[in-house]
Curated annotation (Swiss-Prot):
Recorded name of the encoding gene: Mios
UniProt-annotated location(s): Lysosome membrane
UniProt WD repeat ranges: 58-100, 111-155, 182-221, 223-261, 265-306, 320-360, 395-437
Keywords: Lysosome, Membrane, Metal-binding, Phosphoprotein, Repeat, WD repeat, Zinc, Zinc-finger
PANTHER family per UniProt: GATOR COMPLEX PROTEIN MIOS (PTHR16453:SF9), WD40 DOMAIN-CONTAINING PROTEIN MIO FAMILY MEMBER (PTHR16453)
SMART domains according to UniProt: WD40
Organism expressing this protein natively: Mus musculus
Residues bound to Zn(2+) 3: 827, 830, 858
Regulation: The GATOR2 complex is negatively regulated by the upstream amino acid sensors CASTOR1 and SESN2, which sequester the GATOR2 complex in absence of amino acids. In the presence of abundant amino acids, GATOR2 is released from CASTOR1 and SESN2 and activated.
UniProt function note: As a component of the GATOR2 complex, functions as an activator of the amino acid-sensing branch of the mTORC1 signaling pathway. The GATOR2 complex indirectly activates mTORC1 through the inhibition of the GATOR1 subcomplex. GATOR2 probably acts as an E3 ubiquitin-protein ligase toward GATOR1. In the presence of abundant amino acids, the GATOR2 complex mediates ubiquitination of the NPRL2 core component of the GATOR1 complex, leading to GATOR1 inactivation. In the absence of amino acids, GATOR2 is inhibited, activating the GATOR1 complex.
Name of the protein in question: GATOR2 complex protein MIOS
Family statement: Belongs to the WD repeat mio family.
Amino acid sequence: MSGTKPDILWAPHQVDRFVVCDSELSLYHVESAVNSELKAGSLRLSEDSAATLLSINSDTPYMKCVAWYLNYDPECLLAVGQANGRVVLTSLGQDHNSKFKDLIGKEFVPKHARQCNTLAWNPLDSNWLAAGLDKHRADFSVLIWDICSKYTPDIVPMEKVRLSAGEAETTLLVTKPLYELGQNDASLSLCWLPRDQKLLLAGMHRNLAIFDLRNTSQKMFVNTKAVQGVTVDPYFHDRVASFYEGQVAIWDLRKFEKPVLTLTEQPKPLTKVAWCPTRTGLLATLTRDSNIIRLYDMQHTPTPIGDETEPTIIERSVQPCDNYIASFAWHPTSQNRMIVVTPNRTMSDFTVFERISLAWSPITSLMWACGRHLYECAEEESDNSLEKDIATKMRLRALSRYGLDTEQVWRNHILAGNEDPQLKSLWYTLHFMKQYTEDNDQKSPGNKGSLVYAGIKSIVKSSLGMVESSRHNWSGLDKQTDIQNLNEERILALQLCGWIKKGTDVDVGPFLNSLVQEGEWERAAAVALFNLDIRRAIQILNEGASSEKGDLNLNVVAMALSGYTDEKNSLWREMCSTLRLQLNNPYLCVMFAFLTSEAGAYDGVLYENKVAVRDRVAFACKFLGDAQLNKYIEKLTNEMKEAGNLEGILLTGLTKDGVDLMESYVDRTGDVQTASYCMLQGSPLDVLKDERVQYWIENYRNLLDAWRFWHKRAEFDIHRSKLDPSSKPLAQVFVSCNFCGKSISYSCSSVPHQGRGFSQYGVSGSPTKSKVTSCPGCRKPLPRCALCLINMGTPVSSCPGGSKSDEKVDLSKDKKLAQFNNWFTWCHNCRHGGHAGHMLSWFRDHAECPVSACTCKCMQLDTTGNLVPAETVQP
């Protein structure tokens, strides 16, 4: 310690004690602030802690440096270096009854008096104490003392014997050090290297020197001015820090020629540097007359690539107090905690808080790291907000194989949870499109298959000017209404809407029966009414009222329908026009809107947004002329595209308009899963190549990867390759011929010709078992199997030779002809190999290559070696 500025030290093994050193030694006990408030004389260190003075030691004047004994016992033994070069062992009144009490008061005296600059206890051999002294031309500057050595014999003059304070016994001085190092030079700083108790790093006058006590005549050194405050990183023993003036040098002892990193501080000189004992690669520095401590985080420092490459660091500054800081000390166990002391002995307990790093997992778990602690955010609210998140929904749908049912396409909405009416409409639309495309292809290939997937908008446009209306009688009423004659295109539109089945029959009876079975009484009654069957509508409403979950008010509605009259000025029409606005069910509203509207003016039905789009479109196809229908479909399509409503796929189909609609849907919901499966269902090639479609598909694939759904990702890729052959990836691995370099698998997987069928890597599955034993390109023979000695490509036979367990190689006929058994298999180290089936059989009982004179341990070169049972491996 220089001047009167105090220094501070934490006890190495007593985490609640520290000592302040200046002209005397003061021992403090740290406790929580709540308890310390009850004691007089406590000093507040922070909001949570306070210090109580335990003892003061004033027996060692002229202190220049202090080092706390590193062992557990004795607890409060300190070495004090004095201005005359002596090192005194003292305590703070805690060890008078200890078995080590003879150590207290012991002095270690150099031959020539000069200032002691630094002290360092050996962390491995705790009895060794290194002292660094100023230069003397006739003496060494680094002395290593053994504190357990006996006192000096008779050659010591009696005048050097003194009485210990408070004791009658005499304690003799020790003048013979264990080692003497560094002649004709000053030692400014010392530290032992933890990797070896015999290695000592010393900051001499103009160099850093590493002394090996096993051979003290030699030393390794490097010339530098940064010789002060040498300290070893406790987590990386080859990394050392030292300083000079305003610069900090970071050294790597494995490359000791020059610093690996130089940190430039402020113009003011440094007074202390210290590695954090609880945090990897965190270095704290303090400059003179400053209230700021700078921290350098070298945890993320990359390894230098070239001689001139300096690693990057993360730098930050902390201000523990407002006054100038004289010294600081890291707490030995509490994370990132330090205590600072000012020149007037004001102390502050301070914790350096880490930068918080957030991590949000793909399954919506939120965690953050703060130092050693890892916290997980748990949702305590019961609003099921997590279940409503689209990522959670997509993940659950992926587990249920949503979108992969290509036979009964409509079932995909059930796999999605059967909760979203838009998804239900979408998958029923795609189901009808697939169904009627197949039906049209069977009737007249190439006729209307592509038109079906183009949507009702394109279908309606193809029949403009071809439809006329005619008057039709009501069922149950003496009335006639104009209905458009259904041509082929309008019938197809009604089929896509689900009102009628495929074929020439236009009866909506089956559709009504399905609605009744699902309990959609109001919708079924409305569809029956739109088909001029008021009697069937009343019957359905009565059935709904009498059902278990039915609404009794349906009887009232049925009664109102039964009183229908065609007179424009009747009381019935007036009352229904008023009361329909008070009905909650949209289908009941449109029923009365239809009955009270004028011929051709059906806006009350067509623009009721709560009615399903497919029902409104089907209604329009029955009652609107070509011009009105086209105008209505165009307007409705634009509304669906802007809103991103999946029901609009019925209108747009899987066309560019459909991509625009789906883009709005994805922007609104983020559901790339539905967008991907929908576009793959039947879109033409130009639509599949759209950048937006490819973007949704790739993002969904990335989502499956992020969720670690590897099998689901594979299923999706297979599903995609079936519906979009152009997306099938090229082979990433193939076997090439040693002579011509051409791929063997390319020719083997080609279409069979002239009665010779080749399957990939060998034999076909045909009963003839065609053989491929040569390269299809140059006709050179393929390599031979190391076990059966037959050219590769032939059908695998049972493994030749005896085995320790015949049942292990007794392959069934199915396994003998399995394609995997014929694959080319070889070791990347020795290049020997053979049929996969033979290799698996061999390595069940052996670890060494089957080729004679080859000692390669093929199966133990990678993790696949773990597949071989240890008890079956031959030594």
